[in-house]
């Protein structure tokens, strides 16, 4: 069953073409990564799918229904979107942030239901938020903040989740923490589409990859089949080695040095040092 289908998407900012004929479909219950160099259209693509930008050309269907056939509130019950830099209300606690994920499911008077409470409690447990539940969201570390935002997304209880670089600016420990949480969400049956820069992390955690460059899909398929040396070299205009990681064999991408290391001079090569002991 297909969760989302995009056909022939085009988008331009004035005269700069950002997406040029992008087509793909997302299977349900998979973690799909979007990779590619800077300015390849990754974030723009997510914004189009989330109706943060208007469709200029092409079509998008969610669960077989045209994207524009949904009201914004109805769309928010089907699709959750976490941008790169989400806005945070001053002083909001983690508990309140997660509860906000239930807003699309509430009526005019925002009545709180037993289902709302159940989904919030589940998000709190899955994202392991007990220790920070009453803290100000603005006081959290990078990894804690991303887990709190993911808690809000999980409480929203949509089948389709779009994440724009949730691991950017995080150290390796917090990257792993966030990606384990994202993988857990997908393993529970959600379809997750994530923009990610770290190719090794993408290859290890994602079921499938969509490679973008110059606004076009360059490759799509199972992550470990897509992540080839030829593709990475071409996408990033570089030269890499791809090695299997110990244990699970996940691809480890290592860029080759473009120049030889400079030979370090010895003391004898400096006349002024001769005779010095």
Residue ranges and their predicted role:
Residues 111, 136-140:
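Conserved ABC ATPase signature
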Residues 161-165:
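Catalytic Walker B motif of ABC-type/P-loop ATPase nucleotide-binding domains
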Residues 235-277:
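ABC ATPase nucleotide-binding domains
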Residues 4, 18-21:
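Conserved structural motif at the start of ABC-family nucleotide-binding domains
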Residues 35-37:
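The feature captures the beta-strand-to-loop junction immediately N-terminal to the Walker
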Residues 50:
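Helix-to-loop junction immediately C-terminal to a conserved catalytic motif
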Residues 58-66, 75:
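Conserved ABC transporter NBD signature motif
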